[in-house]
Design a protein with these regions (language model features):
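Short amphipathic alpha-helical boundary/capping segments
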Residues: 7-10, 98-106
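Σ70-family region 2.3-2.4 aromatic/basic alpha-helix that recognizes the −10 promoter
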Residues: 16, 34, 38-45, 55-75, ...
C-alpha cells in the first residue's frame, strides 16, 4: 500500500465520526451521511494524485466529503442543515432543541462553517482551504453566526 493510501486510511480511521457528524448535519439523514462519507473517501482514493500538498491532506479530504454531502443533500430534498446528533452535550443540559432550531435557521454557509469549526474542530485556515474561501470570510461568517445566535438566545430569554 502506498504511503498516501496509508495517510488516507489514518485520516479515515481517526476522524470518521467527525466526518459522519458533519455530513449528517448537512444532509439531515444518517444513512445518506454514511453514504456521503463513504463515497467521499472513494473519490479521495481515486483522485489522490490531485492532492497538491498546498494544504494538509485532511483539509483536502474535508473539502471532498463536504461537497459530496452537499451534492447528496440537494439530490435527496434534504431537511435544512442542522444539528441532528442525539449524543450532543446540549441535549443533556436541556438546551438542545432550542439551540438546534436556532442553528437550523441560520443561512447554509453559516451553519456549514459553524459545524466545521465546532464539530470537526478545524481551524479557520483549514475551513477556508476546505471550502475554497478566504480566512477572512470564515471569520466574518462565524462572527455573523455567533451574533445571530446570541441575539436569538437573548430574545428567547426575555
Amino acid at each position: 500500500m502506498s504511503a498516501r493510501l496509508v495517510e488516507i486510511e489514518n485520516v479515515y480511521r481517526s476522524r470518521y465520526r467527525s466526518f459522519l457528524r458533519v455530513a449528517s448535519a448537512i444532509v439531515g439523514d444518517d444513512d445518506l451521511a454514511r453514504d456521503a462519507v463513504h463515497d467521499g473517501f472513494v473519490r479521495v482514493v481515486v483522485h489522490r494524485q490531485r492532492w497538491r500538498g498546498d494544504a494538509p491532506l485532511e483539509v483536502w479530504i474535508w473539502g471532498i466529503v463536504v461537497n459530496e454531502a452537499r451534492r447528496r443533500g440537494r439530490r435527496h430534498d434534504p431537511r435544512p442543515i442542522s444539528d441532528t446528533s442525539s449524543d450532543d452535550a446540549s441535549s443533556e443540559n436541556g438546551l438542545g432543541d432550542p439551540i438546534r432550531s436556532l442553528v437550523a435557521a441560520l443561512p447554509e454557509r453559516q451553519r456549514l462553517i459553524l459545524f466545521l469549526r465546532y464539530y470537526a474542530d478545524l481551524d479557520y485556515r483549514s475551513i477556508a482551504d476546505a471550502l475554497g474561501v478566504s480566512v477572512g470570510t470564515v471569520g466574518a461568517t462565524l462572527n455573523a453566526a455567533h451574533s445571530t445566535l446570541r441575539t436569538h438566545l437573548q430574545e428567547a430569554q426575555t
